[in-house]
Amino acid sequence: IFMANYKMIIQYDGTRYKGWQRQKTTDQTIQGKIEAILSRQYGRTIEIDGSGRTDAGVHAHGQVANFRLPDACCAGKTPEELCEELRQIFVQYLPEDIAVTEVRVASERFHSRLNVVKKTYVYRIWNADYPNVFERKYMLHDNRPMDVEAMRQAARYLLGKHDFAAFCGNAKMKKSTVRTIHEIDIRRIGEEIRFTYTGNGFLQNMIRILTGTLVDVGCGVYPPERV
């Protein structure tokens, strides 16, 4: 059976979901929602592979995923026609907090996770005495004074290839905890402090733990070199 390979770009608001990865105990996952729609539409189990497994409550602007459709699902349609059909299916059936922004035919060998070059995560803090009403779902409110330059100094110690086991939320992690961080950008934008991390991959809860550590430095809990 010939299986055409399709690549899609997904954006989602992760507020009410238990993360990306499908779970047996809940249907509130991003992967589970998309797979359910595809499987129902084509009358067979269709599994998708994501480039990364975002944690519960994490949002995505450009999650990459791929899946395969057997010829039997195509009903004589061209790849371009099938891509358009898939776009319409997602628009019609996905909830309003998940959107597939792009669908196209990928090469036979393309795999969204195995072909990752780098990933970028952003963590946002609203650093003011008052909360941000309209962005409250997307920013942590912390009103403590923070030294951005001290956090930047600490971030330099985290760059490069390291064993980040101490920054992993899963103590039972059996796979390698070695990762490479290419860049950490920390900047103040008005009342917001924005942390942008780029690397070859990140562990479970790693972004949250990294940010918490840098914030401790920014608040003077310990000096940058302690990182």
Protein language model annotation of sequence segments:
Residues 2-227:
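Structured-RNA-binding interfaces characteristic of tRNA pseudouridine synthases
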